[in-house]
Regions:
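Nucleotide-activated chemistry modules centered on ATP-dependent adenylation/adenylyltransferase
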Residues: 1-171, 175-184
């Protein structure tokens, strides 16, 4: 079939095959940077300045430029919220902060590999590459898929993809994460 070249490629080739460019540099060609504050979501204290809110993603911890803050010890900071209108990047300390967690999400623009399930079903879901399977219950609300996780999941990010598998690992479909919730909020 001539798929040898494709099958020997690495699993992930960066953002949609843009090649060996630096991500920020690539985006800067299309979206000019607008600097803004990096704010601790718990204290509302400004910790630093970001290089442009579109260059960051929820759950990101590297490249923030806010390490070594006096009085914060060895805290690792993670992006937990982006206010695009106000150009504020919010961060939280440490792994498994409640600001990074969710227990349900809604998926839009779903593509099914076969027939759409007719009722609620158990599924395994991946929210990012190389992530462990997340057992969830898949149901429907209008045209959207509603996923309720069996356990809390960290940094499920609107705009990214969720991919659903059955318990045997068979691909069912996937779509775009629209919004996430923790305990209904």
């Amino acid at each position: 079939l001539g798929l040898d070249e494709v099958s020997s490629k690495h699993r992930s080739t960066g953002i949609c095959f843009i090649g060996e460019r630096h991500f920020r540099e690539f985006l800067h060609n299309y979206f000019p940077a607008k600097k803004g504050p990096i704010v601790d979501i718990e204290t509302n204290r400004v910790l630093g300045e970001h290089m442009g809110i579109l260059y960051y993603t929820l759950g990101q911890r590297k490249g923030l430029g806010i390490g070594g803050i006096k009085g914060e010890g060895d805290a690792t900071w993670f992006i937990c919220k982006k206010d695009v209108e106000k150009n504020i990047l919010y961060v939280t300390k440490g792994d498994f902060s409640s600001y990074l967690m969710s227990d349900e999400c809604f998926i839009s623009d779903v593509n099914w590999i076969g027939k759409r399930p007719e009722k609620e079903i158990p599924v395994q879901v991946k929210f990012r590459d190389r992530q462990k399977d997340n057992p969830c219950t898949l149901s429907f609300e209008g045209d959207e898929v509603h996923l309720r996780y069996n356990e809390l999941v960290e940094a499920v990010t609107p705009g990214q993809f969720a991919v659903f598998y059955d318990d045997d690992g068979l691909l069912l479909g996937g779509g775009i994460i629209d919004r996430t919730f923790l305990k209904g909020r």
